[in-house]
Amino acid sequence: MSNAYKRVLLKLSGEALMGDDAFGINRATIERMVADIAEVVRLGTQLAVVIGGGNIFRGVAGGAAGMDRATADYMGMLATMMNALALQDAMRHAGIEARVQSALRMDQVVEPYIRPRAIRQLEEGKVVIFAAGTGNPFFTTDTAAALRGSEVGAEVVLKATKVDGVYSADPKKDPSATRYSSISFDEAIGRNLQVMDATAFALCRDQKLPIRVFSINKPGALKRIVQGEDEGTLVHV
């Protein structure tokens, strides 16, 4: 089966790395994610990753607790750096060559984000992990995913979540909620469906960059998406 996508941007939340733990990085969980990523890489699809930091620190929470919001956001960016290094290490153990590029310079640890270099590394078959969000406070890692996906020419943003798509209502609260197989950006806005934060969502819509929302906990889901199967929810123009 041929791949539906040549280049994709995978958005992983920091919380996804916790597994069943209350905090931090669950090694078994990250190894399972890397096994799914390895399948996609071996199929020949170029894969970039934007990773969050909510399993370690959330800037929004810090700001709400009285901390200076910009300072809290920078702390959140450093949390994404820790997650990116953990993901790179797990990939190395799985035989996948990965590079971490950071929006904040930390040259002794990771490479700075340089767009042409990132594209070249993707073309060479390496996984590129983007850390530190956009490098600016007040922007989420969802926005970083939309931005980096647009910059490197990804054909789709794959948003990995704990639910298997976009629903008409919260399925945990409403048993009658139905999952959308596909929905347009305008429909999602009109129905107030929280696919991503507004800035990220608007950027994807304006760049005509579709979003595929799927469950990171569903085995083989990432591979099925890359092969063009109907998995999760496609948000399109």
From Swiss-Prot:
Major subcellular site: cytoplasm
Regulation (activators, inhibitors): Inhibited by UTP.
Localization per Swiss-Prot or TrEMBL: Cytoplasm
Positions annotated to bind UMP: 53, 73, 134-141
Domain of life: Bacteria
GO annotation (BP), single: UDP biosynthetic process
Reactions performed catalytically: UMP + ATP = UDP + ADP
Pfam families reported for this sequence: AA_kinase
Enzyme Commission number(s): 2.7.4.22
Alphabetized GO MF terms: ATP binding; UMP kinase activity
Pathway(s) served: Pyrimidine metabolism; CTP biosynthesis via de novo pathway; UDP from UMP (UMPK route): step 1/1
Principal EC category: transferase
SUPFAM superfamilies: Carbamate kinase-like
Transmembrane segments: none
Keyword match Nucleotide-binding: yes
Binding site for ATP: 11-14, 54, 58, 161, 167, 170
InterPro entries cross-referenced by the UniProt entry: AceGlu_kinase-like_sf, Asp/Glu/Uridylate_kinase, Uridylate_kinase, Uridylate_kinase_bac
Chain's role: Catalyzes the reversible phosphorylation of UMP to UDP.
Protein family membership: Belongs to the UMP kinase family.
Protein name: Uridylate kinase
Native species: Burkholderia thailandensis (strain ATCC 700388 / DSM 13276 / CCUG 48851 / CIP 106301 / E264)
Lineage, opening ranks: Bacteria, Pseudomonadati, Pseudomonadota, Betaproteobacteria, Burkholderiales
Gene: pyrH
